[in-house]
Amino acid sequence: MSQALQQIFNQANTTNFVVSIPHSNTTSAFTLNAQSVPIPGIRIPVTDTVTGPFGLGRAQRPGVTFEYDPLIVRFIVDEELKSWIGMYEWMLGTSNYLTGENTAQKTGPEYITLYILDNSKTEIVMSINFYKPWVSDLSEVEFSYTEDSDPALVCTATIPYTYFQVEKDGKIIAEV
């Protein structure tokens, strides 16, 4: 079988990831309980320019900036709510509505890393570092007596960031 065909059948699995927030005791429970995280969407915005001999046409050209969707992480809320409290404290460290302090991004971690693992979950295939992250949104956490079983409580954190860098084989992918 050719190598191209082997690569087609060797698909990645949705569970091949680890979210890491280095040097952050506040968010350790969140990191351990991360359940799902997509690689955020990125785009180059379209710039409309005039075209045609009389300037009556419109051409779409690539813009000169990148736009990033936020990092969305769904996590399990543990029995003592440490994972939720850690994220709430991170939010308060960014903009504290109780004290009026607004430290912006000074108190949070420098970056978050999303590690994509191979199918054996022993080797890192790719890393994405999200720089200057901050929590903008925590979803609701619903308690309910109407469930037949005892499902896990989940919460979703929306984490904007300034930019990200993709690392593959020890090198930052910066240009083609």
UniProtKB/Swiss-Prot annotation:
InterPro entries: Phage_T4_Gp19. One of its GO terms (molecular function) is structural molecule activity. Homohexamer. Interacts with completion protein gp15. This is Tail tube terminator protein. Plays an essential role in tail assembly by capping the rapidly polymerizing tail once it has reached its requisite length and serving as the interaction surface for the completion protein. Its main location: virion. It comes from Enterobacteria phage T4. One of its GO terms (cellular component) is virus tail. Keywords: Late protein, Viral tail protein, Virion. It is found in: Virion.
